[in-house]
């Protein structure tokens, strides 16, 4: 999509993402095209491609581009997956998942954010996305199992419903830790036993709280 932000998008990919080690060509190509500035308030459009998160209202944020790329890369998407996203937020991460997977199911607890994200995603033609308003820590049982699950808010621990809804061999990426700083963790389910998991620490991060039954209390 050619627009006045095209050069900023390409610079973002080169200096913030490729330069920091995310080299997946599908991610780089998609992030070179997705108009991130449409997912923030118009007054912040000129800051959309900077290396930092931005407020999107309701005390929520759009993550910095590098973190979006890093988390997406950890999901190891090939193009045919069914993906669950917890925390639609602005819809930018959702759009990237829609570019890289076959089906995306996204849950957002704040109705105004969910509705705005749906509007933008429809405007951009992402029709392989379903959005539901509710408590994302329960997952989306009727659509499970999922090949990959991405959580875009910090949890005190791994919500067990998400492990239960993950395919064997499926990947779950989420921030786990305190309310102000977390570790970004990749969890791979190894068998039918929901306790048989491989966990990898991808580094420190800061996310808003995951609010819900299996997260933080509101």
Swiss-Prot record:
SUPFAM superfamilies: S-adenosyl-L-methionine-dependent methyltransferases (SSF53335). It catalyses: [protein]-L-isoaspartate + S-adenosyl-L-methionine = [protein]-L-isoaspartate alpha-methyl ester + S-adenosyl-L-homocysteine. The keyword Transferase applies. It is found in: Cytoplasm. The active site is at residue 63. Keywords: Cytoplasm, Methyltransferase, S-adenosyl-L-methionine, Transferase. GO terms for molecular function: protein-L-isoaspartate (D-aspartate) O-methyltransferase activity. Its main location: cytoplasm. One of its GO terms (biological process) is protein repair. It is an enzyme of class 2 (transferase). Pfam families: PCMT. GO terms for cellular component: cytoplasm. InterPro entries: PCMT, SAM-dependent_MTases_sf. Its EC number is 2.1.1.77. Belongs to the methyltransferase superfamily. L-isoaspartyl/D-aspartyl protein methyltransferase family. Catalyzes the methyl esterification of L-isoaspartyl residues in peptides and proteins that result from spontaneous decomposition of normal L-aspartyl and L-asparaginyl residues. It plays a role in the repair and/or degradation of damaged proteins. HAMAP family: PIMT (MF_00090). This is Protein-L-isoaspartate O-methyltransferase. It comes from Syntrophus aciditrophicus (strain SB). The lineage of its organism: Bacteria, Pseudomonadati, Thermodesulfobacteriota, Syntrophia, Syntrophales. The gene is pcm.
């Amino acid at each position: 999509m050619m627009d006045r932000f095209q050069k900023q998008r390409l610079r973002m990919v080169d200096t913030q993402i490729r330069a920091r080690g995310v080299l997946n060509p599908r991610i780089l190509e998609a992030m070179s095209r997705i108009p991130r500035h449409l997912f923030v308030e118009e007054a912040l459009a000129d800051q959309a491609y900077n290396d930092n998160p931005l407020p999107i209202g309701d005390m929520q944020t759009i993550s910095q581009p590098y973190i979006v790329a890093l988390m997406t890369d950890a999901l190891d998407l090939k193009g045919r997956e069914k993906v669950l996203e917890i925390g639609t937020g602005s819809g930018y991460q959702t759009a990237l998942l829609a570019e890289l997977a076959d089906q995306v199911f996204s849950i957002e607890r704040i109705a105004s954010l969910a509705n705005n994200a749906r509007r933008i995603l429809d405007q951009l033609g992402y029709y392989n996305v379903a959005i539901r308003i509710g408590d994302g820590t329960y997952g989306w049982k009727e659509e499970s199992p999922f090949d990959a699950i991405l959580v875009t808010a910090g949890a005190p621990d791994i919500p067990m419903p998400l492990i239960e809804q993950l395919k064997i061999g499926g990947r779950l990426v989420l921030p786990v830790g305190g309310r102000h700083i977390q570790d970004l963790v990749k969890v791979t389910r190894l068998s039918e036993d929901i306790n048989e998991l491989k966990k990898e620490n991808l580094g420190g991060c800061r996310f808003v709280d995951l609010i819900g039954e299996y997260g933080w209390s509101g």
